[in-house]
UniProtKB/Swiss-Prot annotation:
Residues 1-33, 68-97 are annotated as: Disordered. Pathway: tRNA modification; N(7)-methylguanine-tRNA biosynthesis. Pfam families: Methyltransf_4. This is tRNA (guanine-N(7)-)-methyltransferase. It comes from Chaetomium globosum (strain ATCC 6205 / CBS 148.51 / DSM 1962 / NBRC 6347 / NRRL 1970) (Soil fungus). It is found in: Nucleus. The active site is at 192. S-adenosyl-L-methionine binds at residues 111, 134-135, 169-170, 189, 267-269. NCBIfam families: tRNA (guanosine(46)-N7)-methyltransferase TrmB. It catalyses: guanosine(46) in tRNA + S-adenosyl-L-methionine = N(7)-methylguanosine(46) in tRNA + S-adenosyl-L-homocysteine. GO terms for cellular component: nucleus; tRNA methyltransferase complex.
Length: 293
């Protein structure tokens, strides 16, 4: 009984802390200990997720409010169509029209974790809208609160307005969020290695998923990968090399890319590998032009 009470008290403290962080006047950076969660989540589980049926129905305005475009209003708007009578068993499922933005998301960090890469990329790529995708609830909340605090702390400079985070299962719903050839850069940093052979199907790089990356990444765009697990690195290289829509970027070009240095040093997992004197294996893959047929 005593152990259950301690767990309950800790849970209540976490909930109270997160509720306090959600207040508008809070600019303090969140503390990780109040957002702890398991290191990985099963992507095949039925998570309680909300996702658009089509990218055109995704409303990005809550993530990037400073990029909302005010639509011109007409002096005499047309009357609305008649609304059919509905019963409680027949809810109105008509999708709301998303608020337009001045630009679209062009950079995605798949499995963004606690947001280290997002925060490092934001000021170095001020013209790009950058999105972190994370399946774990508490970790997503941490990144949300982190971005909120950084925006408040840097309000005068207008920093971190171009970065957002979304809870999503990219193994299932990536094309629901992004149109064909929308993304210029995709980062896959220190993904779950799933060491057991029977779990390899859960790896974030596979023949099937690489086709989805090929769909959302524009020709000339880059997929960045990094891991401290050699077996996983070789797996990712093998599967991207085997895909007709990608070619591996040369090591010379790779090392000249400023995003590679950021990817190596700014993610939380990368810093952990550094502390333990581990190796970091990097590979970049360029999206090729589609055949002209």
């Amino acid at each position: 009984m005593g152990g259950d009470k301690i767990k309950k008290d800790k849970r209540q403290k976490r909930e109270d802390y997160r509720a306090a962080m959600r207040k508008d006047d809070i600019s303090e950076l969140p503390r990780k200990k109040f957002y702890r969660q398991r290191a990985h989540a099963n992507p095949f589980s039925d998570h309680q997720l909300i996702y658009p049926p089509h990218p055109d129905q995704m409303d990005w305005s809550s993530l990037y409010p400073h990029y909302i475009v005010d639509e011109p209003t007409t002096t005499s708007p047309p009357p609305p169509p008649p609304v059919p009578e509905q019963t409680p068993s027949e809810p109105d499922l008509t999708p709301l029209r998303p608020k337009p933005l001045s630009k679209e998301v062009s950079v995605a960090d798949i499995g963004c974790g606690f947001g280290g890469l997002l925060i490092a990329l934001a000021p170095t790529m001020p013209e790009a809208l950058i999105l972190g995708l994370e399946i774990r609830v508490s970790v997503t909340h941490f990144v949300e609160d982190r971005i909120k605090a950084l925006r408040a702390q840097n309000q005068a400079a207008g920093l971190y307005r171009n970065v957002g985070v979304l809870r999503a299962n990219t193994m299932k719903f990536l094309p629901n969020f992004f149109r064909k050839a929308q993304l210029e850069k995709v980062f896959i940093c220190f993904p779950d290695p799933h060491f057991k052979i029977r779990k390899h199907k859960q790896r974030i790089v596979s023949t099937t998923l690489n086709s989805e990356y090929a769909y959302v990444v524009k020709p000339g765009g880059i997929v960045y990968t990094i891991t401290d697990v050699l077996d996983l690195h070789e797996w990712m290289v093998q599967h991207f090399d085997a895909h007709p829509s990608f070619e591996r970027v040369s090591e010379e070009e790779q090392e000249a890319d400023p995003c590679v240095a950021i990817m190596r040093t700014e993610t939380e997992e990368g810093k952990k590998v550094e502390r333990h004197k581990g190796e970091k294996h990097v590979a970049l893959f360029r999206r090729l032009e589609d055949p002209a047929w």
